[in-house]
Amino acid sequence: MKIINILFCLFLLMLNGCNSNDNDTLKNNAQQTKRRGKRDLTQKETTQEKPKSKEELLREKLSDDQKTHLDWLKPALTGAGEFDKFLENDDDKIKSALDHIKTQLDSCNGDQAEQQKTTFKTVVTEFFKNGDIDNFATGAVSNCNNGG
């Protein structure tokens, strides 16, 4: 009987020891998971902190129409650094130029609208080779109202 009592006590001690280790293990696993999560967040933050290009920064400030006309303008400014030079201008001047482009393109309608828009794109391309954005509204004008 003494042997059975001793074995029973040893069994209870072992069982109690296993439970305490399991609780510690669970706590450690939870802490490691939290650390891993923090580490993952810091890695995600570093990948998201890439500097935005001038174009991306500008797009955040533009309306949908202005974004559309910026997309229209980009292939027109194909020369070396022309589009980047355009982006260096003041945001208000860029918005004004994009609104002017919208006005000019909206005035192109009728049978020859596509040809007139293509001609206007050429005018814009030539203007930005030599012109200053301050004179854009007067220097880059479509012929849509004249012949349309």
UniProtKB/Swiss-Prot annotation:
A lipid is attached at C18 (N-palmitoyl cysteine). Residues 26-61 are annotated as: Disordered. It is a lipid-anchor. It is found in: Cell outer membrane. The keyword Signal applies. Keywords: Cell outer membrane, Lipoprotein, Membrane, Palmitate, Plasmid, Signal. InterPro entries: Mlp. Residues 1-17 form the signal peptide. Residues 39-61 have a biased composition (Basic and acidic residues). A lipid is attached at C18 (S-diacylglycerol cysteine). GO terms for cellular component: cell outer membrane. Induction: Induced when grown at 35 degrees Celsius. An outer membrane protein that may participate in pathogenesis. Some human Lyme disease patients have antibodies against this protein. The Mlp proteins probably undergo intragenic recombination, generating new alleles. Belongs to the Multicopy lipoprotein (Mlp) family. This is Lipoprotein MlpC. It comes from Borreliella burgdorferi (strain ATCC 35210 / DSM 4680 / CIP 102532 / B31) (Borrelia burgdorferi). The gene is mlpC.
